Amino acid sequence: MENNEIQSVLMNALSLQEVHVSGDGSHFQVIAVGELFDGMSRVKKQQTVYGPLMEYIADNRIHAVSIKAYTPAEWARDRKLNGF
């Protein structure tokens, strides 16, 4: 699976302002930014992002995924820590 495919799946499934995906074809890192994460715990944020990806994880198109999810305010504060 390609990085842009994951980005497209997440943008279509969730109301996100930004999605950044990096990876090597089976192991991916996802940074998702959206207002929908406001008030959610870190675990709930990750579960929200995992949801649209589960079919790709189940059929091994995605072997491993690391997720960081932020509200726009959190992203404005932390984006430099993530190399943006």
UniProtKB/Swiss-Prot annotation:
Phenotype reported upon loss of the gene: Deletion mutants grow faster and have higher viabilities in rich media, but have lower viabilities than the wild type in the late stationary phase.
GO molecular function list: 2 iron, 2 sulfur cluster binding
Disulfide bonds: none
GO cellular component: cytosol; iron-sulfur cluster assembly complex
Keyword Nucleotide-binding: no
Pfam family, one: BolA
Gene3D superfamilies assigned: BolA-like (3.30.300.90)
Keywords: Stress response
Induction field: Induced by acidic stress during exponential phase.
UniProt-listed GO biological process terms: cell redox homeostasis; cellular stress response to acid chemical; intracellular iron ion homeostasis; iron-sulfur cluster assembly
Summary of the function given for this chain in its UniProt record: Involved in cell resistance against acid stress.
The family this protein is said to belong to: Belongs to the BolA/IbaG family.
Record-given protein name: Acid stress protein IbaG
